[in-house]
């Protein structure tokens, strides 16, 4: 109606301060009378959550652009002032960025990072702004290493090329968790009008508050990760050939440097994908989890060079995919099993006193394989699970470190790995080098990664997983589907399914409502959240199935796992006759 159009035009007038290219896009929409598109751009503001922001680059309050970056940073800055007072001006923040860009709107990660830095500087806050593209894990590393109040990483990770994001780290070096997300969100809403100096990125050329941490952090990071290098002699002499792709992202130079730090033979780089390119021209989606479509060029290079392992980072290099002998897929849970086993074996070699094992911890998210739990039970260290997302593992790791515990490893099935505690987030750069050393060590014993995985399952029990997702853009459909699971056959009261695929359901945990039938008081131990959907079913055959919504994509994800006793070789029978009856596959 007329009121809505007037409101939209009011937002449009506010936009005239913005980037000229963004303004031109909006003017074109106004001249064309494209009310629906204007409503999509200006109708609802992006929600700031624990994952920060992630949306398409373009005009309007629902998109990533100069103005929304300024508004977000103003709110974040005000919240930091509230939390740290004058300490913020003494300690400062770090800002990093990836290589994303959107020429039609004039937006890019570098420009957004510069604007964020300008906002902080306008309030007298020292800013450590990386002078060039950097992997996401370098930002939390910088927060911890430099003792800063916070960090910002401008990246959309593995999202489609038109997207960008704004990821936030707290002073403890981990991603933010509640209540910080709500506090920042409220502060953003209270500081929407741009401050006079917020647009002035010319200050970056002369402000004494601006520092470039690039060289220092680069040097310290590679020095620090060498504590995970335990077989330098084998690395130097190994003839193993490894292919690496950065999928048009930032990872190439950093992974090459990591291999060099470990004295590993440099991995063969996929030439067509090694340089940063915001168009991601060789892939439909820049997500190495998608498998063959993203790794076709890697497999071809491996075949040409006789390489036995393929490693792939996502565009911001915080995640890692591994393929053994070209096309044998080692899924996220399996690489988690291999890296967890490897990190523990290396720790044992340097810590022969078995009494210290009681202070060792490993973590994984609740939807990831429980293989670490099986290893922990046999070896005597501690295993804990957290809610989905590395923000929870990073914060729990910090709590344990503050109690003088040792966190050796954490992982999530979505190809995220934290080896050690120098970076309290997933880190695909260090994980690539550690995977390279593990590959070289095993090759010296004429063993492949796949063979070692089998050996792990033989010793600790087979853990067979199948995870996937359904695309759904309609929130009402998603809500109705989960409501049906909560009122199965009974609309009047809560009633979950009692069986699936002929297998009895023995327990239900609903982290949306906080219900857990396994607990004496029926209350879940893990934190619950009514704003996200997540239900886990346990089955009489030892299977577990979880359904949840994604926090960053229009997906309903499912995760299924079956565990067998150590030495049980009938994994394929188990897999096909029982696992496939889990709800995600029906």
Spans of model-derived segments:
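Intrinsically disordered, low-complexity linker/propeptide segments enriched in Ser/Thr/Gly/Pro
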Residues: 569-586
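Glycine-rich phosphate-binding loop plus the immediately following alpha-helix
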Residues: 169-199, 333-360, 364-378, 428, ...
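Phosphate-binding and adjacent anionic-ligand microenvironments
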Residues: 303, 307-309, 313, 323-324, ...
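N-terminal small/polar loop signature for handling phosphorylated ligands or for N-terminal nucleophile
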Residues: 94-163, 258-322
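Conserved phosphate/anionic-ligand binding catalytic regions in large, soluble enzymes, centered on
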Residues: 42-62, 156-159, 242, 246-258, ...
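Short glycine-rich phosphate-binding loop at a beta-alpha junction
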Residues: 87-98, 241-244, 360-366
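Gly/Ser/Thr-enriched, mixed-charge loops and adjacent short helices
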Residues: 17, 37-46, 164-302
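An N-terminal, well-structured beta->alpha segment
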Residues: 6-116, 207-237, 250
């Amino acid at each position: 109606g007329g009121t809505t159009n007037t409101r939209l035009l009011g937002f449009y007038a506010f936009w005239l301060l913005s980037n000229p290219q963004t303004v031109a896009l909006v003017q074109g929409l106004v001249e064309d009378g494209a009310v629906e598109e204007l409503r999509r751009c200006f109708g609802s503001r992006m929600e700031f959550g624990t994952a920060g922001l992630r949306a398409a680059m373009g005009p309007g309050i629902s998109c990533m652009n100069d103005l929304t970056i300024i508004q977000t940073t103003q709110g974040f800055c005000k919240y930091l002032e509230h939390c740290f007072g004058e300490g913020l001006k003494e300690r400062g923040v770090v800002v990093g960025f990836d290589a994303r860009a959107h020429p039609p709107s004039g937006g890019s990660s570098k420009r957004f990072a510069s604007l964020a830095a300008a906002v902080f500087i306008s309030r007298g806050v020292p800013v450590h702004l990386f002078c060039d593209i950097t992997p996401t894990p370098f930002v939390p590393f910088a927060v911890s290493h430099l003792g800063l109040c916070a960090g910002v990483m401008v990246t959309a990770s593995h999202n489609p090329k038109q997207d960008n994001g704004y990821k936030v780290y707290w002073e403890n070096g981990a991603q933010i968790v509640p209540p910080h997300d709500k506090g920042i969100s409220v502060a953003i809403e209270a500081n929407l009008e741009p401050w006079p100096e917020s647009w002035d990125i010319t200050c970056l050329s002369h402000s004494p508050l601006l520092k470039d941490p690039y060289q220092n952090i680069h040097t310290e990071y590679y020095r620090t990760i060498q504590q995970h290098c335990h077989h330098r002699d084998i690395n130097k002499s190994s003839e193993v050939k490894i292919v690496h792709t950065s999928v048009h992202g930032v990872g190439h130079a950093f992974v090459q440097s990591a291999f060099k730090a470990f004295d590993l033979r440099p991995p063969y780089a996929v030439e067509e994908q090694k340089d940063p390119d915001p168009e991601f021209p060789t892939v439909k989606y820049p997500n190495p989890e998608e498998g063959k479509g993203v790794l076709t060029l890697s497999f071809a290079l491996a075949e040409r060079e006789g390489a036995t392992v393929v490693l792939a980072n996502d565009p911001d290099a915080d995640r890692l995919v591994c393929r053994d002998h070209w096309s044998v897929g080692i899924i996220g849970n399996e690489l988690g099993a291999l890296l967890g086993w490897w990190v523990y074996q290396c720790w044992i070699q340097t810590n022969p006193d078995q009494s210290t094992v009681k202070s060792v911890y490993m973590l994984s998210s609740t939807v990831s394989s429980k293989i670490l739990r099986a290893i922990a039970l046999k070896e005597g260290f501690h295993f804990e699970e957290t809610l989905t997302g590395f923000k929870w593992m990073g914060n729990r790791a910090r709590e344990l470190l503050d109690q003088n515990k040792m966190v050796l490893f954490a992982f999530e099935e979505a190809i995220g790995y934290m080896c050690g505690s120098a970076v309290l987030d997933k880190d695909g750069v260090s994980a690539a080098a550690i995977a390279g050393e593990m590959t070289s060590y095993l090759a010296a014993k004429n063993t492949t990664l796949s063979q070692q995985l089998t050996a792990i399952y033989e010793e600790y029990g087979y853990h067979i997983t199948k995870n996937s997702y359904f695309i759904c853009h309609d929130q009402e459909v998603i809500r109705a589907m989960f409501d049906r699971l909560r009122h199965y056959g009974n609309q009047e009261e809560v009633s979950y399914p009692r069986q699936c695929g002929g297998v009895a359901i023995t327990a239900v945990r609903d982290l949306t409502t906080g219900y857990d039938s396994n607990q004496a008081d029926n209350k879940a131990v893990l934190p619950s959240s009514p704003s996200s959907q997540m239900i886990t079913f346990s089955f009489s055959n030892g299977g577990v199935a979880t359904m949840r919504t994604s926090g960053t994509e229009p997906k309903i994800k499912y995760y299924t796992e079956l565990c067998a006793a150590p030495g049980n070789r009938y994994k394929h029978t188990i897999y096909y006759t029982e696992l496939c009856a889990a709800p995600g596959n029906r």
